[in-house]
Amino acid sequence: MIEVSGKVKWQSRRGMRELDLMLLPFVDIDLPNCDETTLKAYVDLLEASDLELVRWFNGTQEPDTQSRKEIVEFIKKCHAKRMGHEGV
């Protein structure tokens, strides 16, 4: 279990409600149970713009690095699991 800093939690609050609905539960519920590599990938993901993140999460654009692609897919899976859509 890792400690998620207040800074990372604050940076997870974005300017778009759609992103907040994906990222805030992830940072509070799922990320603390991950390893340092996942935390680093998530922190890197937060450097992207809101528009990039929305496009990556809704699948209209591919993330620009493999690391970002993997963390986006992981966040989407965690979100689907929380929503009861594990097989999606």
Question: Which role fits each region the language model picked out?
Answer:
Residues M1-V88:
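Positively charged, polar, low-complexity stretches
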